[in-house]
Regions:
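Short hydrophobic-aromatic micro-motifs
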Residues: 68-70, 118-119, 125
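A mature extracytoplasmic/lumenal domain signature
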Residues: 73-74, 103, 122
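N-terminal secretory signal peptides
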Residues: 27-86
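Short, surface-exposed beta-strand/loop "edge" segments at domain boundaries and coil↔beta transitions
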Residues: 66, 104-108, 124-127
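Charge-dense polyanion-binding interfaces
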Residues: 86-119
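N-terminal export signals
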Residues: 5-24
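C-terminal partner/receptor-binding element of secreted or periplasmic proteins
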Residues: 124-154
Length: 154
């Protein structure tokens, strides 16, 4: 291949390379949050692939900055209850806990303990709780949502 063809091929492939490099980028991640690789990362509790961007959650903290990813806020609620002895740092105020806002499709993240929740949305694991940024008619806080999830069981 001569020099002229090599340069022409490189110029022709540049837009393709730029388009492909943008494919993996999805959403703006809050400071400190580890990126969730949609359709590849799995929920630490149920081992399902995290696909539905409207219900994902993430927990991060401890001395080693451990990250736990969830496909459903309900899985996170049970993880917090079941693993409290193994990871006591999860109860500390410095622990970061995010949940995807239902209308944000993985683009908007809320602090899980400050978010409001609405029931009746079909979530991946059937806990059917969705996070919203502002209180709506019939919405409730994190503690009430937690009680609903634990009462449902699984």
């Amino acid at each position: 291949m001569d020099r002229r063809r090599f340069i022409a091929a490189g110029l022709a492939l540049t837009p393709l390379a730029a388009a492909l490099s943008a494919c993996g980028k999805s959403g703006a991640w809050p400071e400190g949050m580890a990126e969730i690789k949609w359709d590849r990362d799995t929920c630490v509790r149920c081992s399902m692939v995290i696909s539905d961007r409207r219900f994902a959650a993430e927990l991060r903290g401890g001395e080693k900055n451990i990250v736990f990813k969830f496909d459903d806020i309900g899985c996170a609620v049970f993880w917090l209850r079941d693993k409290a002895k193994d990871y006591p740092w999860m109860a500390e105020p410095a622990t970061r806990f995010w949940v995807s806002e239902i209308s944000g499709s993985g683009e908007k993240w809320l602090e899980a303990r400050k978010a409001k929740y609405t029931g009746g949305k079909m979530s991946p694991m059937g806990y059917n709780q969705a996070a919203v940024a502002f209180a709506e008619a019939g919405s409730f806080d994190f503690d009430e949502m937690r009680q609903h999830v634990l009462a449902k069981g699984k």
